[in-house]
Amino acid sequence: MASLRKTHPLLKIANDALVDLPSPANISVWWNFGSLLGLCLASQILTGLFLAMHYTPDVESAFNSVAHICRDVNFGWLIRNMHANGASFFFICLYLHIGRGLYYGSYLFVETWNVGVVLLLLVMMTAFVGYVLPWGQMSFWGATVITNLLSAVPYVGTTLVEWIWGGFSVDNATLTRFFAFHFLFPFVILAAAVLHLLFLHETGSNNPIGLNSNADKISFHPYFTYKDLLGFAVLLMGLTSLALFSPNLLGDPDNFTPANPMVTPPHIKPEWYFLFAYAILRSIPNKLGGVLALLASILILMVVPFLHTSKQRALTFRPASQFLFWTLVADVVVLTWIGGMPAEQPFIIIGQVASVLYFSLFLVLFPLAGWAENKVLGWT
């Protein structure tokens, strides 16, 4: 008699996705990050739910309600620290997951890749509205600066900004709607992640050599479930260590001051995981141009599959393209550093050079390197 997991309508779906899924035998630790992102999402939804039970989305009491969570709620300090630092780990896993996709040519699964880019945008929006909720100085001014960027939209910009604010400045209406969005978006992300998996399982996973692996597949369970559990343990140990020993390491000290519309902080900057895009935004001395560059810095990922010129899928056997890939990694690190620096020389020019290099790598250098490698190898 067939096992229940293979016949039950619901269990069969889970079985095909997590137990009997044929997986390439040679996938490395870089393929762990999908499941780690699932763990991050589950952790964020769970801790966020408990925080929402005690949080008050009102300008008069939001800051105090967060203090109340940390002081008076049972393990509230831990829940809050896990949630705040969980966001950082979420983005670390996201960026490593995207880097893996770029290195091994996983972007050639176009539907899966594009849903992934939409997921990235959703996670970024969720993190942004979430950062506003504690209603500290950086929350308030970050919200003011970033929402104000929409005023660069021709003709309807100002109306659009006031519509999002729910008034003539960032105020109670803004905070209330941002809380509503922050509560809703994780469930939208969950649905999009299911779609992401659905498209992935139509094609099967890529592998480190970028070749068809249909002849050499093994079942997901037990091999990769146990391999993923090791990743889970490392991630949870890292997250709990950060939350317990140095919970404010990645935060901004300004956010311990309640929001004050009368006092502008000396340096307004977002959380570390947005700094690379913020640096690109600031590198263009024009509001609309900066906003378009900011959008392009993320949306350029959607163009990557169409600019793939190499006859090989992965970068495993392509040293020239590997050099460009690591140049891109270094460039993003430089942009992240510049985004946290004041807008003055020499940081302005460094940011501009790094921004030009960022777009050049995607649009010109990677396609050229792929074409050159084909020529050298005699693949026409």
From Swiss-Prot:
The cytochrome bc1 complex contains 3 respiratory subunits (MT-CYB, CYC1 and UQCRFS1), 2 core proteins (UQCRC1 and UQCRC2) and probably 6 low-molecular weight proteins. The gene is mt-cyb. It holds the Pfam family Cytochrome_B. Keywords: Electron transport, Heme, Iron, Membrane, Metal-binding, Mitochondrion, Mitochondrion inner membrane, Respiratory chain, Transmembrane, Transmembrane helix, Transport, Ubiquinone. Heme b b562 binds at residues 83, 182. Heme b b566 binds at residues 97, 196. A ubiquinone binds at residue 201. It comes from Scomber scombrus. It is found in: Mitochondrion inner membrane. It is a multi-pass membrane protein. The chain crosses the membrane at residues 33-53, 77-98, 113-133, 178-198, 226-246, 288-308, 320-340, 347-367. Component of the ubiquinol-cytochrome c reductase complex (complex III or cytochrome b-c1 complex) that is part of the mitochondrial respiratory chain. The b-c1 complex mediates electron transfer from ubiquinol to cytochrome c. Contributes to the generation of a proton gradient across the mitochondrial membrane that is then used for ATP synthesis. This is Cytochrome b. SUPFAM superfamilies: a domain/subunit of cytochrome bc1 complex (Ubiquinol-cytochrome c reductase) (SSF81648), Transmembrane di-heme cytochromes (SSF81342). GO terms for biological process: mitochondrial electron transport, ubiquinol to cytochrome c.
